[in-house]
Amino acid sequence: MKRRTAREKALQTLFQIDVSNIDPKEAITHALDEQESDPFFEELVFGVLEQKDKLDDMISQHLVNWKLDRIANVDRAILRLSVYEMVYQEDIPVSVSMNEAIELAKLFGDDKAPKFVNGVLSNIKNDLKQQ
């Protein structure tokens, strides 16, 4: 499975878990739709779920005039996925994670999603550089 496909499937899985609160393994089965799983895909899904509180704190610190629970579910899932990559996937350049997130926002979000996602991630990127 290509990494872009793994990210798309991970996003679909995380979105489904977030909105319907189903078991992660069931959400994975739905997202894979009889495709074979992939270690990168599973690492993204389970990594985001394990670090969700930390990721949400990081994202919340960079939301201007928004609360995390008020942003679109798909945007929230994209941000969690990308911030997880930016912080925990050291083999992936931050710029690649950001570009992939923007592409996911174009594909799955509304017209304003790419700009919103880019803005939040840019602020997080700047914070990560300072650490």
UniProtKB/Swiss-Prot annotation:
Keywords, sorted A to Z: RNA-binding, Transcription, Transcription antitermination, Transcription regulation
PANTHER family: ANTITERMINATION NUSB DOMAIN-CONTAINING PROTEIN, N UTILIZATION SUBSTANCE PROTEIN B-RELATED
UniProt record, GO biological process: DNA-templated transcription termination; transcription antitermination
Entry protein name: Transcription antitermination protein NusB
GO MF, one annotated term: RNA binding
Chain's gene name: nusB
General function of this protein: Involved in transcription antitermination. Required for transcription of ribosomal RNA (rRNA) genes. Binds specifically to the boxA antiterminator sequence of the ribosomal RNA (rrn) operons.
One cellular component term from this protein's GO annotations in UniProt: cytosol
Protein family (similarity comment): Belongs to the NusB family.
InterPro entries attached to this UniProt entry: NusB-like_sf (IPR035926), NusB_fam (IPR011605), NusB_RsmB_TIM44 (IPR006027)
Pfam families for the chain: NusB
